[in-house]
Amino acid sequence: MMEVSYPPLSRADFSAIWSFIVNQGGGAGVFTFKPDGYKDARGTVTSCTSAVEAVGATAITVTMSGSLLQGDYIKFASHDKVYVVTDDLSGSGELSIFPALIAATTAAAVTFDDVPFAVSLTSDEQQFSRGPADLHEFSMNIIEAV
């Protein structure tokens, strides 16, 4: 689960976010979220392709230029789950991930920058507050929807 907090927003800026959130229908809606500070790999990776791996694998054979670092997020082309890299890897080899694969991978490109998380709101009810200078404060809790 992630808590996402927005800085104080003008009514115009807040209204765009609020209308999107209420249109999700609470926890029933699924949308794409790319968290600032986490959506891009910290390593030097410029290309990465996975081999075919079975459900349950935690070591994925990859052909890679550059490096992925512990804590980087990745997504395989074959499904929507996002995984975290658990050990640094430079160049091609066995990439350690968490959790174990929930679906088999295909021999395809691995997304390591601008990683899209498929998420849902954790509650059907959302709140905001309006503070001084008509600035709106809003936070939401989301969870990966896979």
Regions found by a protein language model. Give the residues of each.
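Extracellular/virion structural assembly segments
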Residues: 1-146
